[in-house]
Amino acid sequence: MSHTEVKLKIPFGNKLLDAVCLVPNKSLTYGIILTHGASGDMNLPHLMSLASHLASHGFFCLRFTCKGLNIVHRIKAYKSVLNYLKTSGEYKLAGVFLGGRSMGSRAAASVMCHIEPDDGDDFVRGLICISYPLHHPKQQHKLRDEDLFRLKEPVLFVSGSADEMCEKNLLEKVAQKMQAPHKIHWIEKANHSMAVKGRSTNDVFKEINTQILFWIQEITEMDKKCH
């Protein structure tokens, strides 16, 4: 399915956040917000590849850049983007999925667990965590799991089985205690950057993109049956 690229500036305090939307050339239903990790920006090859894959299957996709290592700042920026989409007269979406890579997924998780039930028009449908940074390398005793336990909407984790910031058995233990419906897809032998020895980057991207699309489609199909 064809789509159009639209560049945006989203108000955030007295600044503007750079964003790019891929808008499918059909009536819109669901959208996905994506952002980068501690380094890079919205033009990270993997985010571009994922956005393009989702848009080609009919999903509105917004990527945005928010630089800086201050997680509170990143969370506020993410909230501004979500509010922009929610109140946008231009893109009337039935719901959105919040997503991000590494630190971006932490920001998305925090935004999602602080949505008040009375905001509750079910606009946010799920969370996509790519390389969720559960702990600093070699600091497995300090887990960033508080927000994960507060989530209620469905969560998809896509992580490398050799991720130095997300030990496999630790994420599995955390997931077992979560109240939200969740799924973990492990990319075999991938590190935190999703690099796998002996596998091309595009091949890894393809696996990740396929898993994410399938998971989103499962939820949106269920939505259609319920309404």
Swiss-Prot record:
A Pfam family found in this protein is Abhydrolase_11
Highest rank taxon of the organism: Eukaryota
Tell me the name of the encoding gene: TEX30
Q: Which Gene3D superfamilies match?
A: alpha/beta hydrolase (3.40.50.1820)
Q: What is this protein called?
A: Testis-expressed protein 30
Originating organism: Homo sapiens (Human)
